[in-house]
């Protein structure tokens, strides 16, 4: 929880004149937070390196739920190390993040998921911001190209899932993957990626949101015509409910 609090405080800081390093220092030096944060950072650094055991969450018994690099959350752990390096300038965080992210390169070819932004931009994207290394740029561009192949111009969206009884399901979470496409256009000058992301966002704004601006979790489209078939919720209470995490994903529309 201390790590989460750290980054919430950083993200919510309203003083745009302060850089990440300055804001991070002010938090890390806070007397009430420092011992807790230090304990969590040590736990992260000591966590055993394992390509099949990226830490995702804590179980009820206090043990860590580990996942493979294929999981949609895999990029978060190395990404946090890169953010910590930006804040502290301590190389131990950069090097530890590199160790973990090396297991993820193969995911750039995973065309069976829409979670390329979650996985690859939150990890390699942050590493590229730090180093500017061409090999990381290439990984990002390959990831963006893989993601773009899930876009259907008839629907105007990037397909989310390949399972279930839906024809062409698009979930609100998918908004979080568009940043990878915008970055690909910045890096290449090819507007195709930007246009795909923009079209997907406009389609989401049109069909995912109710009159009160709450959102559906899943919109299922006719893959032949692009017409809306169903407005449903897969992870919320019911089809008319507001799934709070999904509502947060949808904030990326703006």
Where are these regions (language model features)?
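Sec-dependent signal peptide recognition
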Residues: 1-5
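C-terminal motif of bacterial Sec signal peptides marking the signal peptidase cleavage site
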Residues: 9-12
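Glycan-recognition and catalytic cores of secretory/periplasmic carbohydrate-active enzymes
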Residues: 19-254
């Amino acid at each position: 929880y201390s790590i989460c609090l750290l980054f919430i405080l950083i993200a919510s800081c309203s003083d745009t004149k302060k850089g990440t390093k300055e804001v991070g220092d002010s938090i890390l030096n806070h007397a009430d937070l420092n011992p807790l944060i230090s304990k969590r950072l040590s736990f992260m650094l000591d966590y055993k390196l394992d390509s099949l055991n990226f830490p995702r969450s804590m179980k009820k018994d206090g043990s860590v739920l580990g996942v493979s690099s294929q999981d949609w959350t895999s990029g978060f752990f190395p990404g946090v190390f890169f953010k910590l390096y930006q804040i502290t300038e301590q190389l131990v965080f950069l090097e530890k993040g590199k160790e973990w992210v090396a297991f993820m390169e193969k995911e750039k070819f995973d065309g069976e998921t829409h979670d390329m932004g979650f996985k690859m931009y939150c990890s390699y994207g942050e590493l590229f911001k730090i180093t500017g290394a061409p090999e990381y740029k290439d990984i990002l561009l390959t990831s963006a190209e893989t993601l773009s192949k899930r876009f259907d111009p008839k629907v105007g969206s990037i397909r989310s899932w390949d399972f279930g009884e839906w024809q062409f399901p698009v979930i609100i979470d998918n908004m979080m993957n568009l940043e990878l496409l915008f970055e690909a256009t910045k890096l290449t000058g090819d507007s195709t990626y930007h246009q795909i992301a923009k079209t997907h966002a406009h389609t989401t704004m049109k069909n995912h949101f109710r009159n009160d601006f709450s959102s559906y979790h899943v919109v299922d489209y006719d893959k032949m015509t692009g017409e809306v078939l169903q407005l449903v919720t897969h992870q919320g209470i019911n089809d008319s409910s507001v799934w709070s995490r999904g509502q947060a994903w949808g904030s990326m529309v703006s």
